[in-house]
Design a protein with these regions (language model features):
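Non-catalytic, usually N-terminal nucleic-acid engagement modules in DNA/RNA processing proteins
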Residues: 1-84, 88
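Catalytic cores of enzyme domains
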Residues: 44, 51-52, 80-168
Length: 168
């Protein structure tokens, strides 16, 4: 059996798979990761913006968060901040790799959830609510500081999500 592949003759333990998947996220640089309550997302998100609208056989939504800027980054001029201020891309890179890891290791279709806008509804409407995924995965809570989520230990984070047909 190749490294990082399951034995298809033995039953899959969802708890072991979940632990390995969340461990992958942390190893790759996420500060927090969790599995969101898919039923709650489907109930809360508006039609056309639910995970099953993009991936009809989705069974799990994995959410991960990476740290925001350092305190020092907030003190530099804007032109300097444009080069090193955002860690958002790191979250997307981890999620992209995670989708491939889940497919390779668990033979379950997976997709990196795009944070992009809905091309039919315009620039103020996201295709999916990455914040909703993070909140329902327990890695962020709504803040009085604005339309953001905060983690109790890490504060402001950037989030990304992966949809998979693997039931966790």
């Amino acid at each position: 059996m190749a490294k990082n592949q399951i034995d298809i003759d033995s039953p899959l333990d969802p708890n072991e798979a979940k632990e390995a998947i969340l461990g992958y996220c942390l190893k790759k640089g996420a500060l927090a990761a969790g599995v969101a309550d898919l039923d709650a997302i489907e109930r809360i998100a508006p039609a056309g913006h639910r995970p099953s609208d993009l991936m009809p056989r989705v069974k799990s939504v994995i959410s991960l968060g990476v740290g925001g800027q350092t305190q020092g980054a907030w003190t530099v001029p804007a032109k300097a901040l444009t080069f090193f201020g955002s860690t958002e891309g790191r979250a997307y890179s981890i999620a992209y790799g995670l989708a491939f890891m889940v497919e390779r290791a668990y033979l379950a279709r997976s997709v990196y959830c795009p944070p992009d806008i809905d091309p039919e509804l315009g620039s103020r409407v996201p295709l999916q609510s990455i914040k909703l995924h993070a909140e329902l995965a327990g890695i962020g809570a709504r803040s009085l500081a604005g339309d953001i989520l905060l983690h109790p230990e890490y504060g402001y984070m950037y989030f990304a999500s992966v949809f998979t047909e693997l039931e966790l």
